[in-house]
UniProtKB/Swiss-Prot annotation:
<comment type="similarity">
    <text>Belongs to the bacterial ribosomal protein bL17 family.</text>
</comment>
<dbReference type="Pfam" id="PF01196">
    <property type="entry name" value="Ribosomal_L17"/>
</dbReference>
<comment type="subunit">
    <text>Part of the 50S ribosomal subunit. Contacts protein L32.</text>
</comment>
<keyword id="KW-0689">Ribosomal protein</keyword>
<dbReference type="GO" id="GO:0022625">
    <property type="term" value="C:cytosolic large ribosomal subunit"/>
</dbReference>
<protein>
    <recommendedName>
        <fullName>Large ribosomal subunit protein bL17</fullName>
    </recommendedName>
</protein>
<dbReference type="InterPro" id="IPR047859">
    <property type="entry name" value="Ribosomal_bL17_CS"/>
</dbReference>
<dbReference type="GO" id="GO:0006412">
    <property type="term" value="P:translation"/>
</dbReference>
<dbReference type="InterPro" id="IPR036373">
    <property type="entry name" value="Ribosomal_bL17_sf"/>
</dbReference>
<dbReference type="InterPro" id="IPR000456">
    <property type="entry name" value="Ribosomal_bL17"/>
</dbReference>
<keyword id="KW-0687">Ribonucleoprotein</keyword>
<dbReference type="GO" id="GO:0003735">
    <property type="term" value="F:structural constituent of ribosome"/>
</dbReference>
Length: 129
């Protein structure tokens, strides 16, 4: 019985699920929008939102805590420099899940998970006419 068990397993081992979610959260923070299955997007939201909340207060302890979860210096830097201050006035609800149809191979329901009010890249702002 799975009583009081939190999280989805996706028919994978616990270490595989942990590594998969770590890679997906890095991709989400890097590109600010990724396409995945609906169930993976829902599980990813449980991992990503506490990291953004932690990044709103820039301290050494918070940086070390976030780095222990995602292990990528560039992403930690972007999280504390861009995303944390961007969501400073917002209390939760930093991500949005948009369903986008079904995968052609196995008809799995697909979705985009994106950050709310995405931070525009400087390249987009310069070349937009």
């Amino acid at each position: 019985m799975r009583h009081r068990k939190i999280g989805r397993r996706f028919n994978k081992s616990a270490t595989h699920v942990k590594a998969m979610l770590k890679n997906m959260v890095c991709s989400l923070f890097r590109y600010e929008m990724i396409k995945t299955t609906v169930s993976k997007a829902k599980e990813l939201r449980r991992v990503a939102e506490p990291l953004i909340t932690c990044a709103k207060i820039d301290s050494v302890a918070n940086r070390r805590l976030v780095f222990s979860r995602i292990r990528d210096n560039k992403i930690v830097f972007k999280l504390f420099r861009d995303l944390g201050p961007h969501f400073l006035g917002q209390f939760g609800g930093y991500t949005r899940i948009l369903r986008c149809g079904f995968r052609s191979g196995d008809q799995a329901p697909m979705a985009y998970i994106q950050l709310i009010n995405r931070v525009k890249n400087k390249k987009e702002l310069v070349y937009k006419k």
